[in-house]
């Protein structure tokens, strides 16, 4: 039996999102761990944009977006509310997260202003903690934000977010999702 192939990078929150859905659904894949500075030729051939995750199905279908991978493996039909949460996470929050975490990559960026802007999304999560598939779509990004300055993050008055994030990070599914794989190297 030919398995679908998942190209992934362990620390990428988009790839985590896809892997969480794969773990939760029991969807079987051949996992190919890549380094983004050394992308495999096969991955670049099927997905020239060069980002992860990429799921190659046995019929040749290529799924290049993490949310689409979630939808495929979970047969998940997002509600309008779920789509809006994901949009806010992927567009608004991620914009500020990148500038907070990597201010040297951007011109005229104030790291603390970017953190404050990102906090608006987290404050909205505090009042409406996601669950199920939506939780898996969002928490990898909150994890990345929290890990940039864990002491500061833990000191914020977000008890619901802290509890939600801790529960996700302590789950068996997340541990399975974060198994360390050696870099995949083609054997030809």
For each predicted feature, which ranges?
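Surface-exposed helix-capping loop/turn segments at secondary-structure junctions
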Residues: 127-134, 172-178
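Short, hydrophobic secondary-structure boundary micro-motifs
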Residues: 97, 154, 175-179
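Extended, well-ordered alpha-helical scaffold segments
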Residues: 113-121, 156-170
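GST-like domain detector, emphasizing the conserved glutathione-binding G-site
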Residues: 1-128
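Residues at alpha-helix termini
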Residues: 25, 46, 132, 148-149, ...
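GST superfamily/GST-like fold recognition
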Residues: 133-151, 157, 168
């Amino acid at each position: 039996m030919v398995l679908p192939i998942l190209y992934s990078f362990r620390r990428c929150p988009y790839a985590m999102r896809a892997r969480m859905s794969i773990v939760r659904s029991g969807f079987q894949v051949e996992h190919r761990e890549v380094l983004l500075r050394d992308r495999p030729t096969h991955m670049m051939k099927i997905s020239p944009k060069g980002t992860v995750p990429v799921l190659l199905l046995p019929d040749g279908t290529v799924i290049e977006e993490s949310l689409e991978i979630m939808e495929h493996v979970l047969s998940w039909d997002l509600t309008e509310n779920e789509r809006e949460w994901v949009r806010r996470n992927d567009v608004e929050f991620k914009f500020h997260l990148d500038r907070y975490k990597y201010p040297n990559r951007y011109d005229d960026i104030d790291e603390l202003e970017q953190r404050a802007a990102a906090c608006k999304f987290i404050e909205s999560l505090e009042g409406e903690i996601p669950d199920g598939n939506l939780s898996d779509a969002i928490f990898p990004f909150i994890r990345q934000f929290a890990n940039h300055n864990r002491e500061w993050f833990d000191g914020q008055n977000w008890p619901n977010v802290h509890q939600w994030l801790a529960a996700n990070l302590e789950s068996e599914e997340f541990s399975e999702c974060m198994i360390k794989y050696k870099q995949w190297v083609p054997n030809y």
